[in-house]
Amino acid sequence: MDNNQIQELIISFLDDVSELSISGKDCNFSIKIVSKDFINLGTIDRHKIIMRLFTDLLQSGELHAISLDLKAPSEV
């Protein structure tokens, strides 16, 4: 899995992403997303939404660790 594949997965899932940055390599990534999809959601619910995208990859070992910074536009 590389940065472009992660980006494509996120963009295809969320309706409105105003900022997306991905850093890392191999199987460890840090992801920052600013999206209207996160309005009125708490931190845990935001993380659940994004982590669902990566469940299979984490279970298979293709991804090992993901650090998330998830915000609504009004929080930036």
Name what the model sees in each region.
Residues 1-76:
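N-terminal, polar/charged subdomain of small-to-medium soluble alpha/beta proteins
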